[in-house]
Amino acid sequence: MKSHHILDASGVFATMVIVVFFVAGMLSTPSFAQEKKTEEKPALDTKFENLNHRLDQLAKSIDDVLWYDKVGDVANIDKIFIVGPPPAKVKNPTAMGAKNPVKFWSYVFIPQKLDRSKKYPLLVLPHGGVHADFTTYHTHIIRELMAQGYIVVAPEYRGSTGYGRAFYEQIDYGGLEIEDNHAARDHMVENYDVVDADRVGLIGWSHGGLIALMDVFEHPDDYRVAFAGVPVSDLVQRMGYYNDEYRQQFSAPYHIGKTANEDVQEYRRRSPVTHVGKLQTPLLIHTNTSDDDVNVLEVEHLIEALKSAGKKFEYEIFEDIPGGHSFDRIDTKKAKEIRLKIYKFLAGYLKPPHPFSSLADLEKAGYK
């Protein structure tokens, strides 16, 4: 499917450079300095926050164009606008449209050499980050999945960056974002004839790993297999080893609105470790002892909880692999070897038409 963009990549980049220089110039002008002295700090904070969201939107526009350069030779790329449940919180519940479903974008990648008379496995790939988005950081993973014959949908669930402040503040970490992710799955199954509804899998890292776990726990009949890499697993434990700035993202009024200390049960409800008893689907979990984001102890807690619940699953705890939190998503030989393990696990259940049998297959597919 062709994209309709006003600017090419170089044009968008030039626009961003102009905006950045304009902002820098604005901040250094005497009039702005005077305004800074006289205006209330909360109002200034709001202006800066709104400006940050505008820059995020511009960065998103640039990255959307870059997808065509990065994977356009192997994938048909689309971006679809779909809906999830209504907002978790509404400032004015009686306002017009207050209870409308939340609208969000999702990326769709379909192999170019796909035979439209056949059906193919689908992978749902939620991005990570408390507030983040799906970007060309995933280029090699998408190329590798296209080569194997997977269709991929990557939802920009509520709270993702690049879509403005209002959408950012719709975040519902471990809550309705899970249903957004599942809505992307349902949309693909219902609207794409080439998707095999009996061969749908989940794959995610970090916060995306949490979403993969929670979705497969809540909707076991809709997935054949799931992979969770370095997944956020226990929010109560996590709040204990993170700093105040991180914790404040969760206790913000538009989010959970309370600290873990004030409402332990709410944080437990949003944690995969609380729901391990629901697992019915083949699952692979990876973690790394040198992870600098999701402490290995957090994932080990999840693993032990699954064992205690008598669940069958597979896992591997890697010892001090270079790359920390991103150890299996970077471009080192070891990272690619680990991705090959993941792909072989998924292929055992999803039966893609062109599964990788060697590291050479992966490297040929993922790297130009």
Question: What label would you give each PLM region?
Answer:
Residues 1, 133, 360-361:
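Bimodal feature
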Residues 11, 17, 22-23, 27-78, ...:
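N-terminal targeting or regulatory segments adjacent to alpha/beta-hydrolase or S9 domains
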Residues 1-11:
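N-terminal secretory signal peptides that target proteins for export/translocation
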Residues 66, 92-93, 137-141, 212-213, ...:
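Short beta-alpha junctions and helix-cap segments that line functional grooves
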Residues 82-86, 157-368:
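Active-site-proximal cap/loop segments of hydrolase catalytic domains
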Residues 15, 23-24, 152, 329:
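Generic detector of N-terminal low-structure segments
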Residues 74-104, 109-198, 205, 240, ...:
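Cap/lid segment of the alpha/beta-hydrolase catalytic domain
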